[in-house]
Every structure is written in structure tokens, then in C-alpha cells.
Curated annotation (Swiss-Prot):
Keywords: Amidation, Calcium channel impairing toxin, Disulfide bond, Ion channel impairing toxin, Neurotoxin, Secreted, Toxin, Voltage-gated calcium channel impairing toxin. The keyword Protein biosynthesis does not apply. The modification Cysteine amide is found at C16. Negative results: does not inhibit human L-type voltage-gated calcium channel Cav2 (CACNA1A, CACNA1B, CACNA1E). It is found in: Secreted. This is U1-poneritoxin-Ae1a. Expressed by the venom gland.
């Protein structure tokens, strides 16, 4: 999961 305010990336990981 990703912290609030962050989006999941298709290849995996999060973008904040």
C-alpha cells in the first residue's frame, strides 16, 4: 500500500 497522498505506480512502488 502507499501512504495517504501517494499514488501506486504500475511497475510497483509509490509516487508522493
Amino acid at each position: 500500500w502507499c501512504a495517504s497522498g501517494c499514488r501506486k505506480k504500475r511497475h510497483g512502488g509509490c509516487s508522493c
